Amino acid sequence: MNDLILQPILFMGVLSFVMMLLMYTTRIPAAKVLEAEGVDLQKLSHPAQLGGVFPSKVERVADNYNHLWEQPTLFYAVVMVIWALGHTDTIHLVAAWAYCGLRCVHSIVQITINHVWLRFSLFMLSWVALATLLFREVVAAFIQ
């Protein structure tokens, strides 16, 4: 059972890979359009210079990809600790898969309808799942 906790990490890796592919399949055509319009892309080499240059849909995909390198890094670390200490149980598995599902739906919402309150709700629910993993492991590792 312990190794099953690693599957959600692989799922998140696949989600990140899919978002990377979407980012490049939207950004490269948009960059070619800008270049054809005479925009010097080299002057946009820093992310802070890109704000508002690309269409919103293109930016949302890139933003989502970047988001997958923020909060999920804590998820990866916590899951690895759970696995390394052999603490995997049903609650950990449910929370880890809930986290993955919520982050996946969050990604879909962000790159499509981008409804702010729905995204925020999904983000907060994913934090509940992550906090469940984190604090159960803190108790298991330090208190018991």
Feature names for model-found ranges:
Residues L10-L21, Q71-L74, W97-C104, M124-F135:
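Hydrophobic alpha-helical transmembrane segments of multipass integral membrane proteins
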Residues V105-A129:
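Interfacial loop-to-transmembrane junctions
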Residues N66-V81:
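Core segments of transmembrane alpha-helices
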